[in-house]
Amino acid sequence: MPVTPPVPVEAPPPVMPADVPPLTEAVRVLLRLTIDAGGEVSQVEVRESGGEAFDRAAMAAALRWRFEPARRGEEPLEVRVDVPVMFEPVADAGALAANEAAPAERSSSMPPASMGAEPPAPAKPELPVFSTTVRGQSAAPPPVAVGDFHITVGQLADVPRNSATDLMLLAPGVMLANHGGEGHAETVYLRGFDAGEGKDVEIRLDGVPLNEVSQAHGHGYADTYFIIPELVQFLRVTEGPYDPSQGDFGVAGTVEYQLGLERRGITASASYGSFASRRLSLVWGPPESTAATFVGVLLRQGHGFGPNRAYANAGLMAQTELRLGPETKLRLFGASYGARYGSAGVVRETDVVDSRLPCDADADSQFFCLYDPNQGGASQRHIASVELTSRLERGGRFVQQAFVIARQMRSRENFTGFLQDTPPIGEAQRGDNTEQSYQGTTVGLRGRYTPGLTWWGQPQPVELGYVARYDNVHTRARRLRDKGGAPYATVFDNQVRVTNLGAYLSLRGAPLEWLTLRGGVRVDTFLFGVEDLNRPAEDRQGARIPEESVEAYGFFASPRASAEVRLTPRLTWLTSVGLGARSSDAAGLSDAEFAPYARVTSGETGLGWRWGDGPSMLELRGAVFATRVSQDLVFSETTGRNQPIGPSQRLGAFGSARFQWDQRLDVQASLAWARATQPLPGASPWKPWDGTVLPYIPQVLGRVDASWRGSATVARQPVGWSVALGHSAIGPKPLPLDRYSESIFLFDVAARARWRSVELGVSVENVLDARWRESEFNYVSNFRGPDAPASLLATRHFSAGAPRTVRGTLTVYLDLQEERP
């Protein structure tokens, strides 16, 4: 919905400072005003100084100005505007005695608003004329599906979260699990998919792709642990492959983190909690800059909630936005991160019940115990990105982005103990601990062009986009000895080079007032070059070099479309269909092969209802969907990564609601159901409910996030406060051999109080101190020792979830701005 900018109603001119000499040339002061929903000026900042005396005079006048507030439809909005004030030299002494200067009539030298608002005309001819630029956030583009969520984190940041990954829980149908430790990427469950650590969900950070091709731990591995939560302003979660801009790995959907720091000044936070957990964060937004300019540093360290769970990591993220002209801005972004962590891995349920683990015999010690202490990992990541945005005539836009990523990761895991090794004759098993390493560089370009076309007097959005990405990585897996941890066998060792070139076209039109159609197509090509460094030194024809080169090519096209019917001004019916794809893992390709890919076909239909666009609003959504994948992947304990199983299908539904009231109460709730099955041979594709249930994917997921903010007077001093609640409900997960896990119910709470620039907070995660299993499996293993006979019976394995965790936090807010009138 278009935004109407504020219009001046009363604008008395500033008074010429008495303590300055007569002017010989004009003096310009550029002010940034915050105009609230009532049209009052609530805050004034100097963007461009004309000297301290002139700054004070301009600010004193601005505080007396009144406006008709900006509006989106009929709802008044709080916005920021840039107002230039000119102090002109007088032509004669008589005029000088008046000691007044009016803002000069001129065009704004600042860029136009991101929402395309034009400078308003003066409300009355006798008022001084000046121009403004609305600096509000542009409205989110219309959703391509009911499951396309543009999520403002806002007040829900009060809910306890360990990392930015947990923000995904704000979207319906999302569950996270981590069996690898504090620093290992989370396993994402979305829309009935076990997306692993990213194989079926595309993850981006302001356009920079985070999925890693041919990763040793799994194709598409995406670690978001390096993202500083305080810097995440928005989250876009597109469930399903319905937007032409969605690329590789967007099988279950796409998640994009959008960064920004609304608050200016310094925010420093230090926390300490259970298990010696320590967290120190520092974020800074220069007062004279926009939310797109910030610096953030985050340090985390702790012993973990059990043996071999210690962790330590540090990260930095910085971004600046430069104005290159009235219509052009340049955004520079950089991030650097390093982490090291331990992992307890999985334990057998029978060993926990019988107290066989090498820990104290009490139930809690056994529950949080481990077998192999040589588990854990380390990770490093460095990102640089440059984005140039130009606004064109008629509301068009041209965006160009270049990025480079340097990445290194190493992990060690043991899922089966002593089962997979084929030792030399007469020797015992050496152990199944698997080391997976990944190191490489990614460079790429991304861009989009919106020409701003108008047909028959109506805007018809058309977007053209492209992506070019090149990965040069070394990926390897080795088996490690149980004693000493030395490698004794190489599982695979590949030097991989992958080039992905893609382009898409999307358009939107409204042939009828109540009907909006969207459509588009995406084309992707992949060129794979693999140097296999783990070939045998001898074959049937004799000795050979233990290396081999493989090259392959892949191509796929993905059409997508949706239709939106406006049943009432607030109620819409949206139906979407689309094809998506997941590229091949280069390690499994043959020379000169036309690289296969996993094709996903998905459809969704549902309703959306929204009331309010200002500080209070209520939004309801609900939909049903069906999805079919030509080649799915399921976790294999023998390799420690996902392996292909053939086609699969999903049938599901979800509902979500978000209620915001006057920046005091913010509640979001969702409930999702999905059934994932593997169809029987020859089964009809039109029966997505038939087939064998896929393991590890929960069928029912529920989530509630809520925050309440207020203020009170304590000892005649105003004190701000907030309380927050997070609740996750996870239904039973099917396991192999017709087994099911237990349901999980978790509650997290937090409370904060702020006096002036100091804030104290406390958070409690898993308030009820539940003993829950974060990941659960059912398979054959042998952890009794290298000489013990292996059992052929599958048994339950699990990784323990965190117990009750309490954390206290001290936060200090510094504005670093000179006090002005």
Model-derived features: positions:
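Short acidic/polar hinge/loop motifs at secondary-structure boundaries
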Residues: 208-239, 257-258, 358, 637
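Transmembrane beta-barrel wall of Gram-negative outer-membrane proteins
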Residues: 272-301, 306-345, 375-397, 456, ...
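Gram-negative outer-membrane beta-barrel transporters
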Residues: 449-450, 513, 517, 525-526, ...
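Membrane-embedded beta-barrel scaffold of Gram-negative outer-membrane proteins
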Residues: 282, 397-415, 566, 572-578, ...
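Short, acidic, small-residue-rich periplasmic hinge/interaction motif at the N-terminus
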Residues: 3-5, 11, 93-157, 165, ...
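Face-selective signature of the C-terminal outer-membrane beta-barrel domain
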Residues: 328-332, 377-537, 566, 618-624
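Extracytoplasmic beta-strand/coil segments of soluble accessory domains associated
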Residues: 165-212
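C-terminal beta-signal and adjacent terminal beta-strands/loops
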Residues: 667, 729, 753-821
